[in-house]
Every structure is written in structure tokens, then in C-alpha cells.
Amino acid sequence: MAVSSKHIPAPDLHRVRRALLSVSDKTGLIDFAKALHANGVEILSTGGTAKSIAAAGIPVKDVSEITGFPEIMDGRVKTLHPAVHGGLLAVRNDPEHVAAMEEHGIGGIDLAVINLYPFEEVRFKGGDYDTTVENIDIGGPAMIRASAKNHAYVATVVDPADYADVVAELEKHSGSLPLAFRKKLAAKAFSRTAAYDAAISNWFAEAIDEETPTYRAVAGKLHSVMRYGENPHQTAGFYLTGEKRPGVATATQLQGKQLSYNNINDTDAAFELVAEFDPARTAAVAIIKHANPCGVAEASTIKEAYLKALACDPVSAFGGIVALNRTLDEEAAEEIVKTFTEVIIAPDATEGAQAIVAAKKNLRLLVTGGLPDPRAKGIAAKTVAGGLLVQSRDNGVVDDLDLKVVTKRAPTEAELNDLKFAFRVGKHVKSNAIVYVKDGATVGIGAGQMSRVDSARIAARKAEDAAEAAGLAAPLTKGCVVASDAFFPFADGLLSAVEAGATAVIQPGGSMRDDEVIAAADEHGIAMVMTGMRHFRH
């Protein structure tokens, strides 16, 4: 049953006479406390926060003085007391509330400055179970929720970035804070506790291997507001979850304009793809446009890999994203800047490479310090009308699969290497995906078609266009291998690849007509390998 309201109107301006400060993150604390004291605000505080304020010579009263109860149980219980929560929740112009405050000696609290134990930081640093549990804040969220609920009389500050605004408003309004400002702070406060609880619930789900918990929360902290979203009429923001997976969200931007919504989406796709290639074994480069690869290649050097990737589709690569699995060096940088590129993302960049890229002031250069683990568990989420689709991350890696040769002819060692390469790439191409590969480089990519046959034909045509642009007598699909992200439902998709010149095929298998497809491969002397794993991508 819903709780009814007495409909007591909130004052526009409410005088701040008393503040409670209890923070884990002490950024800006002392200057803020000094400003509150200068504005005539009495300061209450807890534990380490009180000690820091007192050490700075600022008058402060420990919360135990108003509760009459010391901190106990290693600080687990210190603010869970009616003297604190009554002061936060009391409706100041309700006679019954005022009478209760007087009867029990409860003083009102007009400003609650609270931030929480660093649970998210401990979680993503891989703290042990007991340490992570100990960093679940109880009293902090309770005070935040209490004060934010009572925003008619209490201002709630959960972010040190808001200290300056609070001081400015106090000085502007002679020691009071306006209702609109208090509402804004309350909204942020509830967002903070929601995100905090989401992090805790998601961690617990992971800890007990619960893949589909009854309640699922996805939360993040605003990192930046985009100029616009996918299109200019859409608004957008970039939120960070706190996960330390190397990538665009955790990268350091060394130069260039602010990343756009599309830049971030494409850069993430590019870096996740290139991470499929072990940098200890090979240098690899992926060029991405609209979240699909234009070209991917491996070689002994980043420069060589880039040139091979670029050759796959140099027209589409214009204005694309370039991702590397090794450090960006001078030789590679000199080649990349010859083509208009939006973003370069790499584990690192030499000083010489940075100097070369600096000549293109709008080119964004990101370094990550490492590569994401393609085998790591994680979630992928997508919104639908009225719901949220959540699935585990596609962390299947072709090197871990039991590949089965299903044709009379087995692939050669060179073909098998290219087949694995092609399947790695196909995992990151929008379905239906067909990828032609030769000598460690894509030579044709067909993406996002409703018909697998059409994807095969588009990939072949792309290869023909690239060959013509390079002055080659024949497209590089002659003698190539082909990967399909899902099974061939009919032999026609395979025959399109054969017509393009493919000599070996890798696909998941699992079609009712696998026998027909295998027979067609045998008829044309094609080697076929089945993986047993599909890589649809929508």
C-alpha cells in the first residue's frame, strides 16, 4: 500500500545551518569545509573525515557527540541512529515532526555531504571476496537516500565536483540553497545510490555464477556529453561502468578532438577485433567503418599489416578507425596519416609516432596500455521497447575450438592458418558475414546482408574493385579461403565463394542441408572445416 503525503509545500530557499560530512573520497574536502564554516555552517562529521577537518583547524563536532553512541564494529555502525536520520528526514514545517525533534533532542541537518566506500574500485581491481564485501557501504547510502528524499529541507552532495556550485549558491543566497538546486542534487544522489547498488548486485551475480539474475541493473558514471548521438538530432552521453578492460573507455587520449558517439562505437569494435590476434605471435591491424571491418591483416610489422589491411578496401577506409595490437611506431604512423583517419587506438605509441600524428591535429590518438582478453567473460546489453536484452559476451576463440574437416580434401597448413584468421574476423562482422582471406589479410568482406549469397557476392565484388585499383590482373580471391559466421543453409552461398576463387571454407555447420553443402564442396575440390560455433552479430 502506498504511503500518503501531507502535501506540506517546500520552501524555495532553505537556510543551511548544519551540515553532516562523511566522505571516503576526500578530494576538495578541506577547502569545502572552510567555505561552509565561513558561511556560518556548523559541521558534524564522522571518523576519518572528522579527523581531517579538525587537523585543518576547522571547528567540527563528531557525530558520536549527537548520537551519544560511539562507532562500533570496526566502523560498521556509526550513523545508523535516530539522531542522524531524524535530523535528515524531519519535515521542518510539520508540527508533529517538530514536536518529535524537540522531545527527542534531535537537531535538523540541512546539508548532507556523503560519498561512499570505493566498492566499484575494489571490485574491478580484483579484490578478494571478504575485502570486496567489507567495501559495501551501508550507512552512506542510507544517509544519501534519507537526505535526498527530504530535499525539501536538505541538500545532498555526493560528488566533490559539486562543492564549488554549493558554495556559490550559498554565497548567492546569503547562506540558503534554492529548491531547484536541491532537487538537482537529489536527482544526482539517487542516481549515485542506484549505480552503487547496481555494481554490488552485478558483482554478487558474478560471484555466484548467476547468469540471469531476477533483477538486472546496468549503470555507469557520466564521462562526457557528446555533441550529438548517432545522428545530429539525437543527444548522447558516454558513461563508464568502472570495468578495467583495456579499450576506448579506459584509454588515454593523447591528442585530437573529442570522440564522437560514432567514434566510440567504432573504436570499441576495432580494438575488440584486433585483440583476437596475439601480439607475441604477430602484428595485426584492423580498419573499421560503421562498426564493420574494411580490412584486417597480420604481418611481421605494424606498417606491413596496415598496408595489407588498407589494400582490402582503400575507398571505405577513408575516414575510418585504425586499431593496432602492438605499439604504434614511426614507420606505421607515417603510412596511416597519408589517409584521412578519425581515430588510431593502440596499446602504446612511441614518441616519434606521436610527433608524426601531431601534424594531424584533429586525428585522435588513444593508448590503452594493453589489449582486452577475447576469452574474458562479460555481458552485452541492448535496449528494446520496454525491456533490456542481456547476454554473455561472445568470448569464443577459434584457437580453442575442435575443428573438424568434413570434406575429402583437408586444408593445407597455409589454408588452415588463413581459415582461422578469417573466422576471427568474421566474428566481428555484422551478419550475414562472409570474409575472404589470403596470406594473412582480408581481400573481400561482405557484411550485414539479409542473404548470405549476397554477402558472398559483395565480398567478391569488393575484391575485384580493390584489384582493379591496385592494377592487378585478377582479384586476390583467386586461391583464397572464406569464412562464414553461420552455416550455409543451401549450397548456393558456398558456390558463390567457389566462383570467386575460394579453395577452402570455414563455417560453424549445423544446417539441415550440411550434407548437400559438403557434397558441393567435394565436387569442386574444396576443403571445408566446421567449428561448431556460430558468431551472429547484429
UniProtKB/Swiss-Prot annotation:
One of its GO terms (cellular component) is cytosol. Coiled coil: none annotated. GO terms for molecular function: IMP cyclohydrolase activity; phosphoribosylaminoimidazolecarboxamide formyltransferase activity. Pathway: Purine metabolism; IMP biosynthesis via de novo pathway; 5-formamido-1-(5-phospho-D-ribosyl)imidazole-4-carboxamide from 5-amino-1-(5-phospho-D-ribosyl)imidazole-4-carboxamide (10-formyl THF route): step 1/1; Purine metabolism; IMP biosynthesis via de novo pathway; IMP from 5-formamido-1-(5-phospho-D-ribosyl)imidazole-4-carboxamide: step 1/1. It comes from the Bacteria. It comes from Brucella canis (strain ATCC 23365 / NCTC 10854 / RM-666). Belongs to the PurH family. Pfam families: AICARFT_IMPCHas, MGS. This is Bifunctional purine biosynthesis protein PurH. The IMP cyclohydrolase activity resides in the N-terminal region. Residues 6-158 form the MGS-like domain. GO terms for biological process: 'de novo' IMP biosynthetic process. SMART domains: AICARFT_IMPCHas, MGS. The keyword Iron-sulfur does not apply. Its EC number is 2.1.2.3, 3.5.4.10. The gene is purH. It catalyses: (6R)-10-formyltetrahydrofolate + 5-amino-1-(5-phospho-beta-D-ribosyl)imidazole-4-carboxamide = 5-formamido-1-(5-phospho-D-ribosyl)imidazole-4-carboxamide + (6S)-5,6,7,8-tetrahydrofolate; IMP + H2O = 5-formamido-1-(5-phospho-D-ribosyl)imidazole-4-carboxamide. NCBIfam families: PRK00881.1, purH. Keywords: Hydrolase, Multifunctional enzyme, Purine biosynthesis, Transferase.
